[in-house]
Amino acid sequence: QLFNSDGKSSETILRGLVRYERSPSMDFEAGGEIAYNMLERDQAYSIGGVPEPLPSASVKVEETRGELFGKATWRINPKWTLESGLRLESSTISQSGDADQEKNFFFAKPRLLATWTPAANNQLRLRLERTVGQLDFGDFAASAEFADENVFGGNVNLQPESRWVAELTYEKRFWGEGIVSIGLRHDEITDAIDVIPLEGGYAAVGNIGDGTLDQLVLNVTVPTDKLGLSGGKFGFRNTWNHTEVTDPTTGEIRPISGIRASQATITFQQDITSWKLQWGGAWIPLLGQKNYRPDQISGWRGHDYYELWAEYKPTPTLSIRGQVNIWDDFNVERTEFGDRETRPIAFVENRFIDPRTFYQIRLRKTF
């Protein structure tokens, strides 16, 4: 198998912003942005020297996008702050090459953020917002992942994914830099982006319909000065995700590809000012994710990822940082189906990966 790809890309952005403070309790912000993005790619795929046709192998994708936005912040009293805003986005995406077409999109993106501070060091935030994702122009063209025997066609009908987001976060501060933060979030997803089946046995990144995301976020930072260790901070953070979307091949409910159900990280860092030194480390006990394709389900699972670093600043403008990253072995599993409709299992592949240990040294000088 041979896959050749040649291309170029460019991005130009012009942005303007104006702020106006009417009073200490109220201010306004307005502005606009104009952007031009381009990707041109020419690709070829062959098996045993015989060319194989690919959907959208050679394409040029161009986007012209404009956005107007405004925001108002009202500090009602010491306990309540209200922030509201609106973004109006209009874009035109044109394609030429193997596929010639042009699409226009318009999105109104309102945002509301209410902050309540019932007592000192306690805060409750409610956010309601519509978000629109940015497209990866590479998904309009064909691509290949030979490690998993995947060849993807391009998708000329790809359009942005949008979400209505509702998020509630409680934050408690203590001991100076100590924080406990708990967040609940729910997303209603329209035109969720995943992988869709194409004719000829190919697949492509595409929109697979509506979906949902439910999320719980916990973030804890504990200063260790009161525990007898000066300048130290212990940290724990985790995000639990539950997603649902309808699989375009089976019609069954499943998670969205690439979103990890959970990944806890435990950290510690210490600032030793007398030595002009900072050091720290991180540990991830378990990590992994799954991806869903029309012809296969793949994923990887690992445990015990470590990171250790130290940074020395002999002067305010010079720093020397060393870091080591250590991975334990992890397992990659791929289940291949013999037919997209009946989905009999053709084979299951397991690969055990022994990743390298990474060492880094960085010298930084500012002036």
Indicate where each model-derived feature is located.
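Outer-membrane beta-barrel pore domains and translocons
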Residues: 15, 33-37, 87-91, 115, ...
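C-terminal beta-signal and adjacent terminal beta-strands/loops
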Residues: 311-367
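Face-selective signature of the C-terminal outer-membrane beta-barrel domain
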Residues: 1-101, 117, 123, 182-183, ...
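Residues on the lipid-exposed face of transmembrane beta-strands in outer-membrane beta-barrel proteins
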Residues: 14-20, 68-74, 112-116, 168-172, ...
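Gram-negative outer-membrane beta-barrel transporters
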Residues: 184-188, 206-290
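Outer-membrane beta-barrel channels and translocator barrels
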Residues: 21-25, 77-81, 117-121, 163, ...
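Extracellular loop and loop/strand-boundary signature of outer-membrane beta-barrel proteins
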Residues: 1-5, 13, 51-58, 94-102, ...
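Outer-membrane beta-barrel signature, preferentially recognizing the C-terminal barrel domain
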Residues: 7, 57-63, 103, 132-181, ...
